[in-house]
Regions:
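Beta-strand->loop->alpha-helix junctions that form or flank phosphate-binding loops
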Residues: 150, 155-165
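Hydrophobic anchor at the start of a short beta-strand
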Residues: 25-26, 93, 159, 187, ...
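Redox- and metal-dependent alpha/beta enzyme cores, enriched for Fe-S-associated oxidoreductases
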Residues: 175, 182-209
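Phosphate/Mg2+-binding loops and adjacent switch elements
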Residues: 24, 28-154
């Protein structure tokens, strides 16, 4: 429901892997933000790295993109960033809510970070509270209760929580390092994600300075 990094890409990756595990060949469909004609977005490059063998079709027209994916053998379509894209019928709506900013400053963009009123969450079948490990358990319960109250009786049937934690470091040459390799080290951080503050907190938890 909010702009910025809510952890959608890891959730898309997980969902596609669940489709594969269940025997359905998935394809990821997205708008392709940040890429011009003939170019590949950074998100598409990341998905290609973590989901080898899974097609990623980017098009502003998600219906056309889904048709292309199906024509190439996809049995399941994972629509990235498509909760507000209602032209494409879907079987399951999963919404990611960032635990560190669940209400998008309480206002629609540009005054706040909401794409639509919070009550729109009632259309979701499942809600995943991302970065849940970044807040206290009592706060998690408060957030879920507040969101459920906004949704009313027709709200999501499944409420889940996800922790975002790195499990290895990789150098530009492809060499893998243990997480403690940055402990106590002075680090200059660069990122291209929607929530750079979350990236900074991750480095701080790893002991970088």
């Amino acid at each position: 429901l909010t702009l910025g990094g809510t952890g959608k890409t890891p959730l898309v990756t997980w969902t596609a892997r669940q489709c594969l595990a269940g025997g359905s060949q998935p394809a990821v469909v997205s708008r392709g933000y940040g890429a011009g004609p003939g170019q590949t977005s950074d998100e598409a490059a990341e998905l290609a790295l973590v989901l080898p063998g899974v097609a990623h079709v980017a098009d502003r027209d998600r219906v056309a993109a889904a048709a292309v994916a199906v024509s190439h053998g996809a049995r399941a379509i994972v629509l990235d960033d498509g909760f507000q894209h209602r032209r494409l019928a879907r079987d399951l709506d999963i919404v990611a809510v960032d635990a560190t900013d669940p209400f998008g400053c309480g206002h629609l963009f540009p005054r706040g970070m909401l794409r639509e009123p919070l009550g729109g969450l009632a259309r979701a079948h499942a809600v995943v509270l991302t970065r849940a490990d970044a807040i206290e358990p009592d706060r998690r319960r408060e957030i879920v209760a507040a969101l459920a109250d906004l949704c009313g009786r027709r709200g999501p049937q499944v409420w889940a929580q996800a922790a975002h934690a790195p499990h290895r470091l990789r150098t530009t040459s492809g060499r893998e390092l243990p997480l403690d390799a940055v402990r106590g080290q002075r680090v200059a951080a660069f990122c291209g994600i929607g929530n750079p503050a979350a990236f900074r907190r991750t480095l701080e938890r790893l002991g970088a300075c």
